[in-house]
Amino acid sequence: SLFELGKMILQETGKNPAQSYGAYGCNC
């Protein structure tokens, strides 16, 4: 899910979810 994806990205980058999504783009 998006929530789980956000948690994974947050752990990998250690940055805010918004910044991570901006880098990854929309993984919809």
Swiss-Prot record:
Expressed by the venom gland. Keywords: Disulfide bond, Myotoxin, Secreted, Toxin. One of its GO terms (molecular function) is toxin activity. InterPro entries: PLipase_A2_dom_sf (IPR036444). One of its GO terms (biological process) is phospholipid metabolic process. It comes from the Eukaryota. GO terms for cellular component: extracellular region. Snake venom phospholipase A2 homolog that lacks enzymatic activity. Shows high myotoxic activity, neutrophil activation (demonstrated by activation induction of IL-1beta production), and slight cytotoxicity against Jurkat (leukemia T) and SK-BR-3 (breast adenocarcinoma) tumor cell lines. A model of myotoxic mechanism has been proposed: an apo Lys49-PLA2 is activated by the entrance of a hydrophobic molecule (e.g. fatty acid) at the hydrophobic channel of the protein leading to a reorientation of a monomer. Monomer. Belongs to the phospholipase A2 family. Group II subfamily. K49 sub-subfamily. This is Basic phospholipase A2 homolog BmatTX-II.
